[in-house]
Amino acid sequence: MKKPYTIGLDIGTNSVGWAVLTDQYDLVKRKMKIAGDSEKKQIKKNFWGVRLFDEGQTAADRRMARTARRRIERRRNRISYLQGIFAEEMSKTDANFFCRLSDSFYVDNEKRNSRHPFFATIEEEVEYHKNYPTIYHLREELVNSSEKADLRLVYLALAHIIKYRGNFLIEGALDTQNTSVDGIYKQFIQTYNQVFASGIEDGSLKKLEDNKDVAKILVEKVTRKEKLERILKLYPGEKSAGMFAQFISLIVGSKGNFQKPFDLIEKSDIECAKDSYEEDLESLLALIGDEYAELFVAAKNAYSAVVLSSIITVAETETNAKLSASMIERFDTHEEDLGELKAFIKLHLPKHYEEIFSNTEKHGYAGYIDGKTKQADFYKYMKMTLENIEGADYFIAKIEKENFLRKQRTFDNGAIPHQLHLEELEAILHQQAKYYPFLKENYDKIKSLVTFRIPYFVGPLANGQSEFAWLTRKADGEIRPWNIEEKVDFGKSAVDFIEKMTNKDTYLPKENVLPKHSLCYQKYLVYNELTKVRYINDQGKTSYFSGQEKEQIFNDLFKQKRKVKKKDLELFLRNMSHVESPTIEGLEDSFNSSYSTYHDLLKVGIKQEILDNPVNTEMLENIVKILTVFEDKRMIKEQLQQFSDVLDGVVLKKLERRHYTGWGRLSAKLLMGIRDKQSHLTILDYLMNDDGLNRNLMQLINDSNLSFKSIIEKEQVTTADKDIQSIVADLAGSPAIKKGILQSLKIVDELVSVMGYPPQTIVVEMARENQTTGKGKNNSRPRYKSLEKAIKEFGSQILKEHPTDNQELRNNRLYLYYLQNGKDMYTGQDLDIHNLSNYDIDHIVPQSFITDNSIDNLVLTSSAGNREKGDDVPPLEIVRKRKVFWEKLYQGNLMSKRKFDYLTKAERGGLTEADKARFIHRQLVETRQITKNVANILHQRFNYEKDDHGNTMKQVRIVTLKSALVSQFRKQFQLYKVRDVNDYHHAHDAYLNGVVANTLLKVYPQLEPEFVYGDYHQFDWFKANKATAKKQFYTNIMLFFAQKDRIIDENGEILWDKKYLDTVKKVMSYRQMNIVKKTEIQKGEFSKATIKPKGNSSKLIPRKTNWDPMKYGGLDSPNMAYAVVIEYAKGKNKLVFEKKIIRVTIMERKAFEKDEKAFLEEQGYRQPKVLAKLPKYTLYECEEGRRRMLASANEAQKGNQQVLPNHLVTLLHHAANCEVSDGKSLDYIESNREMFAELLAHVSEFAKRYTLAEANLNKINQLFEQNKEGDIKAIAQSFVDLMAFNAMGAPASFKFFETTIERKRYNNLKELLNSTIIYQSITGLYESRKRLDD
């Protein structure tokens, strides 16, 4: 008889815990065969384990390398096209000129022609370098001279311009003749005063006076931030977040955020240097009005003048080649300053002369010019050298202005706009076309080599198929800047670009999402927010708005006002509903959503009757889509022509100038396509009219009484005909979480194969912390920087009075002290920084309702303040006393909006029974789409058979569980999790997931729709909306394990018995567990990318085929694909066979796998034979069960798991939590101090047997003896850190009683040759062994 079993999964980003358990809560156990070289032919194994693996990485590095390759290739192509244009004429002048240029990189004896790169003779070469010390000398001469020049010189100048053509940050024409910062800043001030004339008249804004000091500040070599601060000081009364400050931010090159100054709903950042500046500005002007356009033009002109002033340093009348002349001036100044510096050093610091001017290893001039020294390091070195030396003021002043000994090629050359280079190119062509007619004929082609960029919607010009390209051709042949429109189908490529760029709906993975500015999407956002807004009438009755009222609000407010405020809604209630003193709940000062696109389209001239007519919905949605996808005005114009029969030319012209950004999360089909089977209404229909219930989107799609949930499940991508790899690849989510999902699916497949039949239940838990996004990781980085900025804005001196650092701020107690500006959050009294352990860390929303240990839910307060607050959010009395202070913290960025809302929740009725039920429900029921996707894949893999009526037959229950339930279970029964001890906790969690899920569904079968994927009960097991009943029910679920000794159903079946706890505890103490680290054949880059200089090193890899590293340098540190153990013959007369480990690099892998024997013979091995292939993390076992994992061909990692008795795990749990406010953990470790000696004895015994780091162990024992009577908190932290000593994996250094214990590295791999290699399946249930000492 097949016994039912459950698979529990705990899925993470670098681990998957799994467990297979019976109905009686024990693990399945079997004797499993061991194949290969093993004395034991079978081992009894518990069916639980952990799959460990390296976290999946994003493709960011690959993408950057690909982008760099394309950029370099396109640069080479531009030069090649220029040579093609010059080829015929150049062959008449110097037939070998281009050959010599292409050979110029090679060493002399490998060049095909003359060893001189430019000219055939040494005399010409010397003459050229004498006349033109830099390329800019040549460019300037050709721009200013009308005489005929050598064609080779013309080519060299044009090639330099085209190769380094400048940036495209400033679009359109650039007025290089007018770079007077002072004059243009005056124009900006005049425009500012004109635009804000009405504000100046009514006193809300001040009239600004021109200040000559501003121009001086703008051109100074100081940071943008310092420029902004100094300019604002010249205008007293102007605030850093004010209107004027934002325009000055634009001018100095920073972001201007106009959200607050213009009172906008969304953040509105624009930056002059950004490619998208024009589009961003148009979007902003659409919100604030075109009357501000002239002011932004004035600000952009001022910004351009500042940029150009930093590049062009020569007077306007001196030359027509201002850029080249400025570079020549930089060269001449460098030469003069260098002469003066040398003379000064010889006179005042003769002993330093050699170091500064000859030693390239130092940060002196030699290192700066010929070594790797950066400008900042050179300046720092020279300043330190010259300080306090009489007469060095001149040099130090230039260093401080960053204008000392500047090189020709510097980082700020990236700021040179392409228009400056273009101006010189056009001048050279104009001067020389008189003598070389082909230049005139090809003028546009040559110019296009500077100005042309491949349109973004065309994408890479791939040859053949490419996973990154979507280009559609009109005609075959080579694509050039001047023929691209003949060769490429812009329209079709643009459509394909739309498809490629559009994201998929979170809920309906086949559907494209709507643009963020879609009228339909904005309508959904408005109604989704409005449906949860309540009002209290004059009689004190609280009501939601009816469907009719919502429609009226939408038409009378949102269609009339771009931004709807709370006071507008109050006025509406007074006028329409005759409520004299309404109180609005569920809304701050204004709505977050708006119907802004409607107003934009009205403004460009589309009539209201067109906008309001449902017949035009599709047209209007298409218009918004075009304006979102395309940035190119010509492309927008072309795409909009399809609507010319409805919209006139004037309207279309205005639409061309508009551009939207951003995409929503939902599709049109989700909002308006799928319909409830009974009512035939869409989700948007319900949002507009859901009288009595007023459900929002999440409630509608999760409501068991509606069919949206089942429709969404059926719409999920089918997995029937796809392999697991491609199924997971199609999921929305990070590469890290996808890798975990893929591993978990493979584990389930193997477990089902071993068991021989499917499980009754599969329980899936995905911990939230395992879905950390890039943003999340950034947010968790060092706290000091953000704190310092916020404290400064807040105007506090607390960081100066009590300095701290990132290490200290990891302590939440101290971090909260600074975030609260040293004040008790509930009482306002000063906190004593020296006695922070005496205060409580309080959860604003109590832990009994929500497991939220984030800073957003924590405050530091006295015990008295905590008691006054009680087991609820802060009462109204505390809110009224402290709200002003909390608002200051919120405005000063020391508190998030979420935290402020938690603290002030009493103003909005406090924690209602419905809130409490919702908080607890949120901890129980998994709502994340990524988890539902995993459940869907498992559901489709096992529940694919249909009954006679076509309904899915459910063979396997797929249960999604949240970690809160298992956490509660662990807490109640002291089954403590200490992650630092070993990796067992992943499998423990998987096992407990199975225990909790099975028991819950036995005791509360009505919970199946909440937990089991694909279950829909078409009734509400809480009649009406009894929030109190729901809250009590959910609370009981969280606590029933502790409250009930035995639960029996009506048939007498025991559903839960406390004796089962003994089984659970026994299982949790099992020592045998299958830990498997995923072996990896390494792929990717061949070696480190850094090119090493030429040298007599056999280790260097040639940069290209036939490039001798001794002549051209090379690459080092080749990356290993895997290692191999080989056997080969040694000796002359008598052959002796030896074994050796060698690495096969990623670069060599293909050749090795093609013919292993030939490859090894080429390496010099006689009669070679491959004994074993060893990918990274291959596991091998030495004497007494000591295990290691291969890290590289010459280093290993620890391979054993340390297991501690339960009482020592309990000790470590309390040690890790001794800072918690209730003091229980601190009391525990204080009263069990002597147990730390026992813990150390266990660690020492394990280390002597497996870790083998004797010197470190002796040091650890000595430190313990010296500190064992010391501060108990220091002991606790030291022993938590000590767990790293024996942890499986790469050795790591750690601190023990503030002393660093350095890592012990395992570099001697000779023992591997006498070990047993262990090959494991993904679960570790199957294994085979191979002895290498035979």
From Swiss-Prot:
Family: Belongs to the CRISPR-associated protein Cas9 family. Subtype II-A subfamily.
Cofactor section: Mg(2+)
Described purpose of this protein according to its UniProt entry: CRISPR (clustered regularly interspaced short palindromic repeat) is an adaptive immune system that provides protection against mobile genetic elements (viruses, transposable elements and conjugative plasmids). CRISPR clusters contain spacers, sequences complementary to antecedent mobile elements, and target invading nucleic acids. CRISPR clusters are transcribed and processed into CRISPR RNA (crRNA). In type II CRISPR systems correct processing of pre-crRNA requires a trans-encoded small RNA (tracrRNA), endogenous ribonuclease 3 (rnc) and this protein.
CDD domains to which the protein is assigned, alphabetical: Csn1 (cd09643)
Gene3D superfamilies: 1.10.30.50, Ribonuclease H-like superfamily/Ribonuclease H
Active-site residues (renumbered): D10, H843
Note accompanying the cofactor annotation: Endonuclease activity on target dsDNA requires Mg(2+).
Practical applications: The simplicity of the Cas9-gRNAs RNA-directed DNA endonuclease activity may be used to target and modify a DNA sequence of interest.
Keywords: Antiviral defense, DNA-binding, Endonuclease, Hydrolase, Magnesium, Manganese, Metal-binding, Nuclease, RNA-binding
A molecular function (GO) term: RNA binding
Limits of the HNH Cas9-type domain: 773-924
Species this protein is from: Listeria innocua serovar 6a (strain ATCC BAA-680 / CLIP 11262)
Protein name per its UniProtKB record: CRISPR-associated endonuclease Cas9
UniProt record, GO biological process: defense response to virus; maintenance of CRISPR repeat elements
Domain-related comment: Has 2 endonuclease domains. The discontinuous RuvC-like domain cleaves the target DNA noncomplementary to crRNA while the HNH nuclease domain cleaves the target DNA complementary to crRNA.
InterPro entries cross-referenced by the UniProt entry: Cas9, Cas9-BH, Cas9_PI, Cas9_REC, Cas9_RuvC, HNH_CAS9, HNH_nuc, RNaseH_sf
Binding of Mn(2+) 2, residues: D10, E769, H986
Record EC number: 3.1.-.-
Positions bound to Mn(2+) 1: D10, E765, E769
Quaternary structure, from the entry: Monomer. Binds crRNA and tracrRNA.
